[in-house]
């Protein structure tokens, strides 16, 4: 049983970029499709199949509506990792006899970078664009990187580690003018910030269910129909999902994703106000009480559900142990098992000391003001204690530049 403190249940969940709790309304919508409405949506000869198919198509239209897409442009997958792989490898395989170059960004999610590395082994040329110290790409650098051999540009909308929002509209405009396909991993922005695939000229977009209060194991790939985008499937079989993704569709999970998208569509404004208020409260109160705390990533051009903070003079891992009543992360959930400093922070030019002290705090739909205040009090008291014990902090206070120290190796 979790301990309770003045109606506050501990530990407090603050890792909304890793996953989100399922919204009770989503759970309620899914349950009948686990029990009485169990039909296969591909069974065309009886009412069990028709009922499941109707539910799938209704969910498909809800997902499409949230990004201004046509219902037929939504392909269901197992999640954003599969969607990213299908988009990048699928385009590369289909168009490789005409073009052989893809552009992405050094700070993309691991699955995008690894899909690109896989293609490099197959002879595709990949350009990894750098990011500025605020985490945003430079549009001129992108323009200059595009050649007549470029088939695809892949840039995520909201970074999973630092929360910065890339200028998708401008990127889409450049890609359309140059005749290059534009893919975006929108998993962290879908349902949280306004995204319009037509206004942004996006050709492919990857979506995840469990980042928007839906179930795990379900996602989608938006694939533009006009002008038509072709991808070679990764999974072959019964030819479901316009031949791009074979396999029996998991009706309950799809219904959950659809319901999560519907709620996000109607409550985005409310959620945004709530998250922005808590972000400002959290950051302002931390800054009032402790010095040398740095927000990683652009303060304004970001999704404010993400606070990635570096605490000078404190080791990130010891900080996480000290604040064990807060469920937080020291990088993306996929790579936080490694003690290497975050590759995203390093690519922003952040030094090893501050990169090692970075912690990502996530705020979401169910975070309360009371939880934020508890978190701030806990963080400030623990930082003070850890800094008292830290020889590095003492040296910094004496004006010693830690970068210039030659550490002896024993």
Swiss-Prot record:
What GO MF annotations does this protein's record show?
A: 2 iron, 2 sulfur cluster binding; cysteine desulfurase activity; metal ion binding; pyridoxal phosphate binding
Residues annotated for [2Fe-2S] cluster binding in this entry = 334
The record's annotation in InterPro entries points to: Aminotrans_V_dom (IPR000192), Aminotrans_V_PyrdxlP_BS (IPR020578), Cys_deSase_IscS (IPR010240), Cysteine_dSase (IPR016454), PyrdxlP-dep_Trfase (IPR015424), PyrdxlP-dep_Trfase_major (IPR015421), PyrdxlP-dep_Trfase_small (IPR015422)
Instruction: Report residues binding pyridoxal 5'-phosphate.
Output: 80-81, 160, 188, 208-210, 248
The catalytic residues are 334
Q: Where primarily located?
A: cytoplasm
Record keywords, A-Z: 2Fe-2S, Cytoplasm, Iron, Iron-sulfur, Metal-binding, Pyridoxal phosphate, Transferase
Query: Where are the N6-(pyridoxal phosphate)lysine residues found in this chain?
Result: 211
Q: Which Pfam families match?
A: Aminotran_5
Tell me which EC number(s) this protein carries.
Answer: 2.8.1.7
The entry sums up its family as follows:
Belongs to the class-V pyridoxal-phosphate-dependent aminotransferase family. NifS/IscS subfamily.
- Name the PANTHER family for this protein: CYSTEINE DESULFURASE, CYSTEINE DESULFURYLASE FAMILY MEMBER
* Name of this protein: Cysteine desulfurase IscS
Q: Which organism is it from?
A: Rickettsia conorii (strain ATCC VR-613 / Malish 7)
